[in-house]
């Protein structure tokens, strides 16, 4: 009888031991995946970003200064260039991972086996985003620019804007003295010295041009075109860093939303990153839109700019811009913002 009781006690203890082991094992198994996922998500995404000194640089500095990059565990290093085209050149030369530029500047670096890819819209000018200022009293209408000297940012969307201006108003480009510059400061210096008769000036420098005697003939409505800007990376980089690029898009979306909601407030956040008055930054932010998306309209504009530029020999290669669009990371995080159909 005693042996029987001992056996029962032993059996109960064995069952309890097995139950505890089973529960502990299940608990460890259940916790394994979340722990691994958390660890993966917390691995920092390191990226070298080339930004321009104007409109497109703003969301990156908002994301950095407001801690949005930190929120998504992104460790970003920055290189600042004069224009968007310079940032795209940096990506082409493997001096940066990401660049950003307006439509013409970006497509001018495609074709000929280029590995560059459009990932998302990032920023664009509204029709009020730039004005055509003249500094010669004899210029009363756009057609009067024939025979005058104008400031041109070679290789940037500004070159395309001038080409559109000349075509739409029947001005022979050969009749205009085009003063090529490599920085905004050079353009302002030409205006100040009196060497320039006209300049397309964006909102961040328009007040300075007006102080120097500039008189506006009108904004982008003169040519019915406002530039759109895009994020550009190499395809090989995108294929290796899909999850990190997804996080980057989320961070930039958050930064863009903050800018759109409060241009004045975000101007205060980034004023130390730029050598222009905070009110100029706020005006530039107000005259721009920020978003992470790729709409049919965005791609249609890229396509239109490309075809016109090839036809008018601003771009030497013939290619289809739609071959340079990479949607995977954007579709993963913001599928509803992709309305472009191949």
Kindly label every feature range from the protein language model.
Residues 57-61, 88, 92, 103-106, ...:
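Extracytoplasmic/secreted envelope proteins and their assembly/folding machinery
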Residues 178-179, 185-272:
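Pocket-lining segment of extracytoplasmic ligand-binding domains
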Residues 32, 155-176, 250-282, 321-325, ...:
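Ligand-binding clefts/hinges and TM-proximal coupling segments of bilobed small-molecule sensing domains
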Residues 240-316:
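Secondary-structure end/capping motifs
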Residues 33-172, 178-182, 197-203, 216-219, ...:
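Short, glycine-/small- and polar/acidic-enriched structural segments
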Residues 1-46, 336-342:
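Short, low-complexity disordered leader/linker segments with a strong preference
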Residues 54, 82-85, 152, 156, ...:
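Soluble non-cytosolic domains of exported or imported proteins
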Residues 310-342:
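Conserved C-terminal helix/tail region of periplasmic/extracytoplasmic solute-binding proteins
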